[in-house]
A protein has these predicted regions:
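Hydrophobic small-molecule pocket/channel-lining residues, especially in calycin-type beta-barrels
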Residues: 1-136
Length: 136
């Protein structure tokens, strides 16, 4: 049986390991997940330098590619299981090349903590961030 990620999580900034680009400006964050296998919906708000940045997505955990177009960019999204972790990947094809963003979501401490390992590649801003959230 796969874990259920549903819940509301608050960023634990001191427990997170963030890149030199993000660390100085990351202040707080909330991650809300609705997970009814195979449907996974996430809404995240991260406050960077006093400004909230929101991101939302809804995907199925079947690993199939979902292709969308947004603002002249082609985005290929996938969500798949890797053991008990869920991995979401976006490949963004734009006029300046390709950027790949992935998050590996894992529950820890009996579901009280969510670890989100982010990897960004391309666009001249490669970075790795380990975001740690505590269940509210």
């Amino acid at each position: 049986m796969k874990p259920d990620f549903s819940g509301e999580y608050v960023l634990n900034r001191p427990a997170s390991t963030l890149s030199a680009i993000v660390a100085p400006v990351a202040q707080s964050g909330v991650l809300r997940i609705e997970h009814h296998e195979p449907k996974f919906t996430a809404h995240q708000t991260i406050v960077l330098d006093g400004k909230p940045f929101e991101s939302n997505f809804e995907l199925l955990s079947d690993g199939r590619e979902v292709v969308t177009d947004a603002g002249g960019r082609r985005i290929v999204s996938t969500l798949r299981w890797d053991g008990d972790a869920l991995v979401v990947t976006w490949r963004i094809h734009g006029p300046d090349g390709e950027v790949t963003i992935s998050f590996r979501y894992e529950l820890q401490d009996g579901g009280r903590r969510l670890r989100a390992a982010e990897q960004l590649r391309g666009g001249g801003r490669d970075q790795d961030n380990l975001w740690v959230f505590e269940r509210r």
